[in-house]
Amino acid sequence: MKLIVGMTGATGAPLGVALLQALREMPNVETHLVMSKWAKTTIELETPYSARDVAALADFSHNPADQAATISSGSFRTDGMIVIPCSMKTLAGIRAGYADGLVGRAADVVLKEGRKLVLVPREMPLSTIHLENMLALSRMGVAMVPPMPAFYNHPETVDDIVHHVVARVLDQFGLEHPYARRWQGLPQARNFSQENE
């Protein structure tokens, strides 16, 4: 499997790093990373890693200004793309087909080729413009996976929350996260079922 990972300047850099770390442990997945200029700044602000450290997690790291990169062409076959975190600027550009950098161009290619595109939008609160852009992309078949925490799994650390979001992103491609803590139903519901068998 070949996956493109785009990281933009929205807050949420730990999500992108954790995704790349998880994919690094999957020998059957080849990763192509594109970090925008502001993604690199955000990585160094929000994580203990440098942009170079993060680039080393991917099999291939592309210059965000290189419109001649392999992933800018539909003839270069991939299984899809994840933009994590996805800024509202990037999301709006993808909706409009405005590919001013490699993140936008790669997403545009994935869309036109009918491949899987997953966006992890990071903004709060959301304006009507943001919501309309997300709705339009959803109608095009784009998966919107906002990084909303779950509490049924009783997260104890920020990493627990990050791993849950990454697991839900990987679910979109049928990939299993080793730290996923999945919903098992309510204990009383299971007891009720057993008592009434």
From Swiss-Prot:
Enzyme class: transferase
EC numbers on record: 2.5.1.129
Residues annotated as signal peptide: none
One of the GO biological process terms: catabolic process
Annotated positions binding FMN: 9-11, 36, 87-90, 122
Subunit structure: Homododecamer.
UniProt family annotation: Belongs to the UbiX/PAD1 family. YclB subfamily.
NCBIfam families tied to this protein: PRK06029.1, ubiX_pad, VdcB
Protein's name in the database: Probable UbiX-like flavin prenyltransferase
Origin species: Escherichia coli O157:H7
Gene encoding the protein: ecdB
